[in-house]
């Protein structure tokens, strides 16, 4: 009985807390999403350039002895 009450109390508190959440407006959500997409794109390009550079340097070093 007590355990069931604790579970009920927990979910009741979760419900109360969700009313306190300040949800973003659609404009804020779109802006934040755009920032994340651009940041991921820039990070991906950086990784691509670094990977390509390291690959070419390794190929150059491995082909020196041939």
From Swiss-Prot:
One of the GO BP terms on file: intracellular protein transmembrane transport
GO CC terms in record: plasma membrane
Keyword Cell inner membrane: yes
Subcellular location: Cell inner membrane
Gene3D superfamilies documented for this protein: Preprotein translocase secy subunit
PANTHER family per UniProt: PROTEIN TRANSLOCASE SUBUNIT SECE
Name of the protein in its database record: Protein translocase subunit SecE
Organism whose genome encodes this protein: Rickettsia rickettsii
Gene: secE
